[in-house]
């Protein structure tokens, strides 16, 4: 089980990461990592970076059966 400090340190070492990458690197369930990232964000230590939809080649993300699964969400330290 990872701690909040380990999540922060991993982000410091690697720059920006997705929650799934952090979960895998720390061998911790993703819901727990999501909660830790939310806590770091509320403390002003981490920032959420969301990709813009202009990366969608077809421009049909709204009608995509996967919703907006092609839009990635990254986390980085402030």
UniProtKB/Swiss-Prot annotation:
<keyword id="KW-0804">Transcription</keyword>
<dbReference type="InterPro" id="IPR023732">
    <property type="entry name" value="FeoC"/>
</dbReference>
<keyword id="KW-0805">Transcription regulation</keyword>
<comment type="function">
    <text>May function as a transcriptional regulator that controls feoABC expression.</text>
</comment>
<dbReference type="GO" id="GO:0051536">
    <property type="term" value="F:iron-sulfur cluster binding"/>
</dbReference>
<keyword id="KW-0238">DNA-binding</keyword>
<dbReference type="GO" id="GO:0005506">
    <property type="term" value="F:iron ion binding"/>
</dbReference>
<dbReference type="InterPro" id="IPR015102">
    <property type="entry name" value="Tscrpt_reg_HTH_FeoC"/>
</dbReference>
<feature type="binding site">
    <location>
        <position position="61"/>
    </location>
    <ligand>
        <name>iron-sulfur cluster</name>
    </ligand>
</feature>
<feature type="binding site">
    <location>
        <position position="70"/>
    </location>
    <ligand>
        <name>iron-sulfur cluster</name>
    </ligand>
</feature>
<keyword id="KW-0408">Iron</keyword>
<feature type="binding site">
    <location>
        <position position="56"/>
    </location>
    <ligand>
        <name>iron-sulfur cluster</name>
    </ligand>
</feature>
<dbReference type="InterPro" id="IPR036390">
    <property type="entry name" value="WH_DNA-bd_sf"/>
</dbReference>
<keyword id="KW-0411">Iron-sulfur</keyword>
<comment type="similarity">
    <text>Belongs to the FeoC family.</text>
</comment>
<keyword id="KW-0479">Metal-binding</keyword>
<protein>
    <recommendedName>
        <fullName>Probable [Fe-S]-dependent transcriptional repressor</fullName>
    </recommendedName>
</protein>
<feature type="binding site">
    <location>
        <position position="64"/>
    </location>
    <ligand>
        <name>iron-sulfur cluster</name>
    </ligand>
</feature>
<dbReference type="Pfam" id="PF09012">
    <property type="entry name" value="FeoC"/>
</dbReference>
<dbReference type="InterPro" id="IPR036388">
    <property type="entry name" value="WH-like_DNA-bd_sf"/>
</dbReference>
<dbReference type="GO" id="GO:0003677">
    <property type="term" value="F:DNA binding"/>
</dbReference>
<keyword id="KW-0678">Repressor</keyword>
């Amino acid at each position: 089980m990872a701690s909040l400090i380990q999540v922060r340190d991993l982000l410091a070492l690697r720059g920006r990461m997705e929650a799934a990458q952090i979960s895998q690197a720390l061998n911790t369930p993703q819901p727990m990592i999501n909660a830790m990232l939310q806590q770091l964000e509320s403390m002003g230590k981490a920032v959420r970076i969301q990709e813009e939809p202009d990366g969608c080649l077809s421009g049909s993300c709204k009608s995509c059966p996967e919703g907006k699964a092609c839009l990635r969400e990254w986390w980085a330290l402030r």
